[in-house]
Curated annotation (Swiss-Prot):
<dbReference type="GO" id="GO:0019843">
    <property type="term" value="F:rRNA binding"/>
</dbReference>
<dbReference type="Pfam" id="PF00203">
    <property type="entry name" value="Ribosomal_S19"/>
</dbReference>
<keyword id="KW-0687">Ribonucleoprotein</keyword>
<protein>
    <recommendedName>
        <fullName>Small ribosomal subunit protein uS19</fullName>
    </recommendedName>
</protein>
<comment type="function">
    <text>Protein S19 forms a complex with S13 that binds strongly to the 16S ribosomal RNA.</text>
</comment>
<dbReference type="InterPro" id="IPR002222">
    <property type="entry name" value="Ribosomal_uS19"/>
</dbReference>
<dbReference type="GO" id="GO:0000028">
    <property type="term" value="P:ribosomal small subunit assembly"/>
</dbReference>
<dbReference type="GO" id="GO:0005737">
    <property type="term" value="C:cytoplasm"/>
</dbReference>
<dbReference type="InterPro" id="IPR023575">
    <property type="entry name" value="Ribosomal_uS19_SF"/>
</dbReference>
<dbReference type="GO" id="GO:0006412">
    <property type="term" value="P:translation"/>
</dbReference>
<keyword id="KW-0694">RNA-binding</keyword>
<comment type="similarity">
    <text>Belongs to the universal ribosomal protein uS19 family.</text>
</comment>
<dbReference type="InterPro" id="IPR020934">
    <property type="entry name" value="Ribosomal_uS19_CS"/>
</dbReference>
<keyword id="KW-0699">rRNA-binding</keyword>
<dbReference type="GO" id="GO:0003735">
    <property type="term" value="F:structural constituent of ribosome"/>
</dbReference>
<dbReference type="InterPro" id="IPR005732">
    <property type="entry name" value="Ribosomal_uS19_bac-type"/>
</dbReference>
<keyword id="KW-0689">Ribosomal protein</keyword>
């Protein structure tokens, strides 16, 4: 179920403060964050966030197309190694 419109997008407060500091300073540094549930806002466009995936911070550069999505969508938590090969077919 989608979030109701009257509530507005969810963003952790500390994230807004960190993004504002980086914008004011003019630095282009990676903003480390653990809040995968936060929504990407238009003021985050052009910034780079390090989204934690459970083991490391994955760098995510925010673009216009990402606005409205969640940060967690761009940092996969699981590694897919493919399905196991058929051992009988391999032996022949």
């Amino acid at each position: 179920m989608a979030r109701s419109v009257w509530k507005g997008p969810f963003v952790d407060g500390y994230l807004l403060k960190k993004a504002e500091k980086v914008r004011e300073g003019g630095r282009n540094e990676v903003i480390k964050m653990w809040s995968r549930r936060s929504t990407i806002l238009p003021q985050f466009v052009g910034l780079t966030f390090g989204v934690y995936n459970g083991s490391k911070h994955v760098p995510v550069s925010v673009s216009e197309e990402m606005v409205g999505h969640k940060f967690g969508e761009f940092a996969p938590t699981r590694t897919y190694y493919g399905h196991g090969a058929d051992k009988k077919a391999k032996r022949k």
